[in-house]
A protein has these predicted regions:
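A long, amphipathic alpha-helix that forms part
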Residues: 366-367, 371, 379, 387, ...
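Juxtamembrane/disordered regions of integral membrane proteins
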Residues: 2-126, 130, 134-146
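Active-site-proximal N-terminal segment of extracellular/periplasmic enzymes that hydrolyze or transfer
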Residues: 150-206, 453
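Short, structured active-site-proximal loop/turn typified by the sulfatase FGly-forming signature C/S-X-P-X-R
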Residues: 187-225, 229-234
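Active-site neighborhoods of enzymes that stabilize oxyanions during catalysis
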Residues: 244, 251-252, 256-263, 272, ...
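Metal-dependent active-site segment of extracytoplasmic phospho-/sulfohydrolases and closely related
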Residues: 418-455, 591-594
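His/Asp/Glu-rich, glycine-adjacent segments
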Residues: 147-150, 229-386, 390-402, 507-509, ...
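Acidic, His- and aromatic-enriched active-site or binding-groove loops in soluble protein domains
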Residues: 229-241, 300-307, 409-417, 455-474, ...
Length: 710
């Protein structure tokens, strides 16, 4: 990745080699060209020699040479155009293919076989068009999802049709976040062969390190920590704001904008760069599919990368390829869900198919992935100093199939291919030299949901343990993938306005608006607001839940107050087999963790009986993390964490078999993959805020250090 492009013929040849580096694919493609050319030439000869004797030995040799010539011409067309630095797009290549095939067919028949095609039933242009069309269809089927086709028809066209920054000795960072992928699951995916590009990086240029994501182990807290170095008062993915008496949900654009506004100082990690497919913008100058930038109350006005969205949507190859792959992924999800049901695999979600998730998986795992990486590579060609994008497909599938399932790990195969594309762009096409980082915001732990284990939800349990007149409400979750798809529809709606008044783009605008009108009713779910004002509010985020008691006051209720109003509730929760511990505050303002065999005072450090945190890893670290979490202004009066069972599983309070948000298992076990030339601390990194310091130092080093200084 230390080679900068220059306008020399040698570098252009290197680019050609980069585009055509898949030799297995090349052999298959060339074999097809030979077969198609042979068939086309046979038709041409038979049309002119209906009454003529069979071909002589010399003519048979000429026929073989003709087939080889036609195949080579079709095969070398695009590399030749790249070498000449000509604009590449499907229309140019198709037109030149028809003309070149027509000319070669005329030469082969008129000169070598002494026959004229002008009066034949199949004129040369018709045969040439048929040959070119057949080649296009076959190559589309053969190379639907590989480097050769993607780079041939997308990257080259971007390089020569878009304005790129001038070559520079600057350096930049491309950071790809894999939502929900733990350190050990990444290693498992590499060992199983799902991520050959990552395996190659590990063996040549990069190092893999683990870090603890901290509490809560979820995306909004992690991204605030990674981008700004602080994630104050984000107690979970969803919580109750006592002061304003409202629900806050991290993947609602208005609430994401509020989180951004609270934490941004203008010096975020992404300042001057690009945010793609994230919850928060990190002070980026440009953004696409970033939830916090879509809200009317957004305080910062990041430039929306509508041009990337429009270019992707109306490129016949990229959109068509992604649409076909999305449908194939839909078929794959149906097959996997049926196989799981027939095999009676546990744990599993019986409503996995048919459900809204079936469509959401297709859109998040393929469509959003391809769009995000398409935008990443365009922004690399513009020479942006830092680009941060999130892949949400693994997290979405792992929630429904389990983080270690082959269904979830297989989603990483498509991500890995795009990482190879990014590396190719960085080496041969970007105007500056880029370093690639791969990281996760948290991991996931597996296990049957709480409701599936015990027949009722946490809300229903609390409802059963309180008096009849007590109203208990629970905030219903919305899938993260659904929020990003709604973000896509919002971006498309806004992008269509950019096309208003341009006559030659009216059909494009009409197409985008029609798509938005069709998909929005199907994707928009129920809101996450409370209709009534309940006595108790349960906000579950994975296997961690905040429970709020309404006493008419803004401050946190103490354990004594809760016991006096709802006698026996706390003891019943602590003793339940599906609950690992309960955190609350005493009348003396001490934070305590209550477990089945004992308790720990987080404020003083005193332990009575068995330490409730013993099963959850580093006890000192967990105690500090829980203390900090409980002291946040918006944390619940009670914080409930599920049990961590002897088989290593947890019980999500949501309807998930892969979960995160609390403690237990691998949900706090995140990773970062970075170049070996980068510094990384020897001491364990125990939070996203701590990793921000490392990332900020890497960014400063990358932007200061000219090429060749490392």
């Amino acid at each position: 990745m230390d080679v900068n492009p220059s306008p020399t013929r040698q570098v252009t040849l290197q680019r050609v080699g980069a585009l055509f580096g898949d030799w297995r694919r090349l052999l298959i493609s060339f074999a097809w060209f030979c077969a198609a050319s042979s068939a086309s030439l046979s038709i041409a000869i038979s049309a002119t020699r209906a009454q003529a004797p069979l071909l002589s030995g010399e003519q048979l040799i000429l026929t073989a040479l003709s087939v080889l010539g036609l195949a080579c011409a079709n095969f070398a067309l695009t590399p030749a155009l790249i070498w000449l630095r000509a604009p590449i797009n499907p229309f140019v290549t198709s037109g030149l293919a028809v003309l070149s095939n027509a000319g070669l067919l005329l030469v082969c028949t008129d000169v070598w076989f002494d026959a004229r095609l002008d009066g034949a039933p199949h004129p040369p242009l018709t045969l040439a068009a048929a040959l070119a069309f057949g080649n296009a269809l076959a190559n589309g089927a053969i190379a639907l999802d590989d480097d050769y086709t993607f780079l041939q028809f997308v990257l080259a066209s971007l390089r020569y049709s878009e304005r790129s920054a001038a070559p520079s000795k600057s350096r930049g960072l491309v950071i790809i976040e894999v939502d929900g992928l733990s350190y050990s699951h990444l290693r498992w995916a590499v060992a199983l062969g799902f991520m050959p590009t990552v395996a190659e990086l590990l063996s040549t240029s990069h190092t893999l390190a683990r870090y603890d994501s901290g509490l809560p182990s979820q995306t909004s807290a992690a991204q605030a920590g990674l981008f700004y170095g602080v994630n104050h008062d984000i107690p979970a993915f969803r919580w109750y704001d006592r002061r304003h008496r409202r629900m806050v949900v991290s993947n609602h654009p208005e609430h994401a904008a509020m989180i951004d506004a609270r934490h941004s100082t203008g010096q975020g990690l992404l300042r001057g760069g690009v945010s793609i497919n994230n919850l928060l913008d990190g002070d980026a100058a440009r953004a696409l599919l970033t939830l916090s930038t879509l809200a009317p109350n957004a305080q910062r006005a990041a430039e929306h990368a509508y041009d990337d969205l429009i270019a992707f949507w109306f490129n016949p190859y990229t959109f068509g390829r992604t649409a076909v792959l999305s449908v194939l992924d839909l078929v794959r999800e149906i097959a996997q869900a049926l196989r799981e049901r027939l095999a009676r695999r546990q744990p599993r979600l019986d409503h996995r198919f048919p459900s809204r998730f079936t469509v959401l998986r297709m859109l998040t795992n393929v469509f959003l992935r391809d769009l995000a990486f398409f935008a990443v590579m365009r922004e690399m060609q513009r020479g942006q100093p830092i680009i941060y994008a999130t892949f949400v497909g693994y997290d979405e599938v792992a929630h429904h199939a389990g983080p270690s399932s082959l269904d979830a790990l297989a989603t990483l195969r498509g991500l890995d291919r795009h990482l190879r594309h990014v590396l190719t762009i960085a080496r041969f096409f970007a105007p500056i030299s880029y370093d690639l980082l791969l990281l996760s915001d948290h991991g996931q732990s597996s296990g049957a949901p709480f409701r599936q284990r015990y027949g009722y939800s946490l809300r229903e349990l609390i409802d059963a343990l309180t008096r009849a007149e007590v109203r208990v409400e629970e905030q219903q979750p919305r899938a993260a993938g659904q929020s990003f798809m709604n973000a896509l529809l919002s971006e498309m709606d806004a992008a269509s306005e950019q096309l208003r008044g341009v006559s030659r783009r009216r059909w494009r605008r009409a197409t985008m608006r029609a798509t938005v009108r069709t998909l929005r009713p199907r994707l928009e779910g129920d809101g996450e607001t409370l209709v009534h004002r309940p006595s108790i509010i349960v906000c579950a985020s994975g296997n961690l839940a905040h429970v709020y008691f309404e006493f008419g006051e803004d401050q946190r209720a103490t354990l004594d107050q809760i016991e006096a109003t709802h006698p026996g509730l706390i003891e019943a929760l602590v003793s339940h087999p599906g609950i690992g511990f309960v955190v609350g505050t005493t009348a003396e303002a001490h934070v305590v963790v209550l477990g089945k065999g004992g308790q720990r005072n987080l404020t003083s450090g005193d332990v009575e009986g068995e330490d409730p945190l013993q099963p959850f890893g580093d006890v000192a670290l967990r105690a500090l993390q829980l203390l900090q979490l409980a002291q946040l202004p918006s944390s619940g009066d009670l914080i409930v964490n599920s049990a961590f069972y002897t088989d290593g599983s947890v019980a999500s309070f949501e309807d998930q078999v892969g979960t995160h948000g609390g403690l237990g298992g691998e949900q706090t076990d995140a990773f970062v993959l970075y170049p070996r030339t980068f510094w990384f601390p020897q001491r364990p990194v125990s939070s996203a805020q701590a990793l921000h310091c490392v990332l900020a130092s890497w960014r400063g080093s990358a932007l200061r250090e000219p090429l060749g200084q490392r």
